[in-house]
Amino acid sequence: MREPALAASAMAYHPFHAPRPADFPMSAFLAAAQPSFFPALALPPGALAKPLPDPGLAGAAAAAAAAAAAAEAGLHVSALGPHPPAAHLRSLKSLEPEDEVEDDPKVTLEAKELWDQFHKLGTEMVITKSGRRMFPPFKVRVSGLDKKAKYILLMDIVAADDCRYKFHNSRWMVAGKADPEMPKRMYIHPDSPATGEQWMAKPVAFHKLKLTNNISDKHGFTILNSMHKYQPRFHIVRANDILKLPYSTFRTYVFPETDFIAVTAYQNDKITQLKIDNNPFAKGFRDTGNGRREKRKQLTLPSLRLYEEHCKPERDGAESDASSCDPAPAREPPASPGSAPSPLRLHRTRADEKCAADSDPEPERLSEERAGPALGRSPGLDGGSPPRLTEPERARERRSPERGKEPAESGGDGPFGLRSLEKERAEARRKDDGRKEAGEGKEPGLAPLVVQTDSASPLGAGHLPGLAFSGHLHGQQFFGPLGAGQPLFLHPGQFAMGPGAFSAMGMGHLLASVAGGGGGGGGGGPGTATGLDAGGLGPAASAASTPAPFPFHLSQHMLASQGIPMPTFGGLFPYPYTYMAAAAAAASALPATSAAAAAAAAAGSLSRSHFLGSARPRLRFSPYQIPVTIPPSTSLLTTGLAAEGSKAAGSNSREPSPLPELALRKVGAPSRGALSPSGSAKEAASELQSIQRLVSGLENQRALSPGRESPK
């Protein structure tokens, strides 16, 4: 402390003097400049603006004391300098929030019974980084307030003790000393301030209060430590402005049954169940109720039981081909072209493929499906020849769309298969079945087409009002998801060409490369995982056993010579493998589609390098119409050419590549003139027989050189 300017040994005190008058004016200390220092003393701005008189005067301190006394008494201070005449000091009473009112607040806890249930078990409140609300919410009812006075209601949460807890042996026990306490935060009710009448009209709920363990929280949430016990507190403050809270009187109310332990995950299962049973926002976790989860569960229970019965052997490690596990209607959308989601959702698990398999599998089919995954093939989309169905079975499946189309089954141990006997049978009965069924199955023209790849001619005339690619396949479901029990519908006017379809003629191996491209090109479709396995060969065959006997120019010329405009290839097919396979299945099932079969078979010679190396558009057919009845003498492609030939040639045609005459004669591909509408069934049959001879020759070649691989 500085020595006083006038040292007097007889003085009993040493008054404090400022070093210079201008350095510390009195207004710097009093309410005129910093009212928070002296909230009870408010002077006019000009009252203490002048500095103290000469510091040598010993009466300066006395003058200051007199000024303080005068201010305390509410008197005018005239000795401190000039000031406006109306200026005066306000008394201490004038700074109180409002006049004294008589009130005696009473607070009761809402939902006390529920709080008691939680309290008996040891209430837990989950805290998260993003903040979590309390349940039960802190809700009270207030009475005894002054109706006209304004109140601020708020709450905070404080540590109940200085212990850390752990849940051990189904009970909470002390685990050590508490962690350092988090910064205190008060939660002011959003309606504050409000009159006592408004507060007493309804319960006061703090349901928006959020608990967090994020110590750097910027949202104003209450920060807590996990595994610590806390006690909520409720406060009533009579004030008409939130800014006056620091100088106001708090009335605090504590309810012991509301204490809880903060956790990051529920420890006590009984607490979890109690919250599920009572929290209206947790109805999705209940077994009974009106929530979406309950309805979904009720709908799926029967099918789940059925699925458990049929798929139990597979879950235990065995292979099961039972396929009567139909999915629940709420889980699988119907396969209508207009309402279902994107058709690219075709990647299926093994269990789903099992459910889509035939309901009465034969022993051969069982062995083939087991051998399928080992060769990188999909059992439902293979290129071999499947066993035939009897006529009643075909009729039954055609009548019931719920049974749907079973995917083409696996075609033997290799891509050619060991089914020569069945193939000969199929060839022998192909024409008879086609003639018998040409007039059958007259159904409405817009009925979904259930494709069956195992019969000679399962498609009636009414099934085929339009067999082509439509230009607006995006946004419609061409094929429904091939889930359990779902039919594979072909919508009229939308068709594709692919390898799995030629199973009835044993030509699946010719389209291995196309299958690989179609599988890999679906924009993340199913083939992304398997379509490019084994050097570009799709699920129809493995790399070690599939030759690609035709050159690239042959396939292009074949398609062009048959009147099918083939746009140049661009990388991979735009549609998943199943699009190509099932549509070509329908095409190959007709008796007079030998030209299309030859064209698509030649297209299969494309190797992986041609798909990946060229930057051209994709294989696509132009739309064309099919007459209502298909006489035996009419070819599928001739009708299409008559209906849409000009449009196809204008939009998608390309010049055919050069082709040796020998290759054309070997394949037996007819010229454009041979495809006139006057072509007879005899010519179609001869074309089909020539293709079959070619396939037989290829199979003999395959038997002679089994180790040859397809060119990379």
UniProtKB/Swiss-Prot annotation:
Subcellular location, principal: nucleus
UniProt-annotated location(s): Nucleus
Key words of the record: Developmental protein, DNA-binding, Nucleus, Phosphoprotein, Transcription, Transcription regulation
Record region (Repression domain 1 (RD1)): 517-601
Segments of this protein annotated with the region Disordered: 313-449, 642-661, 666-688
Keyword Transcription regulation annotated: yes
Ranges annotated as DNA-binding: 109-287
A GO biological-process term: negative regulation of DNA-templated transcription
Disulphide linkage map: none
Pfam families for this protein: T-box, TBX2-3_RD, TBX2-3_TAD
CC per GO annotation: cytoplasm; nucleus; transcription regulator complex
GO molecular function, one term: DNA-binding transcription factor binding
Domain remarks in the Swiss-Prot or TrEMBL record: Repression domain 1 (RD1) is involved in transcriptional repression. RD1 is necessary for its interaction with PML.
Complex formation: Binds DNA as a monomer. Interacts with PML (isoform PML-2, isoform PML-3 and isoform PML-4).
UniProt function note: Transcription factor which acts as a transcriptional repressor. May also function as a transcriptional activator. Binds to the palindromic T site 5'-TTCACACCTAGGTGTGAA-3' DNA sequence, or a half-site, which are present in the regulatory region of several genes. Required for cardiac atrioventricular canal formation. May cooperate with NKX2.5 to negatively modulate expression of NPPA/ANF in the atrioventricular canal. May play a role as a positive regulator of TGFB2 expression, perhaps acting in concert with GATA4 in the developing outflow tract myocardium.
Protein name, UniProt field: T-box transcription factor TBX2
Gene from which the chain derives: TBX2
